């Protein structure tokens, strides 16, 4: 696909690329994963009849080379954009991506850069601390207890959409020290009792 500096620039000045196959994307990563600061991949929308690299295929390739997905953006009626960048040194792992990395390693697809990211995460504790995704995140026992002690908060929590529910669960999970975690739970219970949300 050529030098990323020659591609169109958008948003945060990362290039926009499109690939037809996983092989094309992985060959690009093989050449650029250490030199590029990231890309926006144009991925075909479902139902458009356009074929090409899928999000799942793009993510697998990224993990193999030590990269990670980021924000999504609109492009046009046929394509949407997905940002991919090299994984930062202290970047958190999701349980979903951790499982994919294990599967890719088992299949012999992991490259040196991806394997190095996994090893660093295992050494510094990020591997064990991987967070659950929005679809699988469960309400922890300490939050359940806090909600049970405040019926108004418990009632409002049950009405939250998935984004606001996960925003609370993720922030509680990210608290490294028990006192910090307890304070966050107390704050979110009070917020819910006041019928307030993190996202509008």
Per-region residue spans from a language model:
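Charge-dense, helix-prone N-terminal extensions
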Residues: 1-200
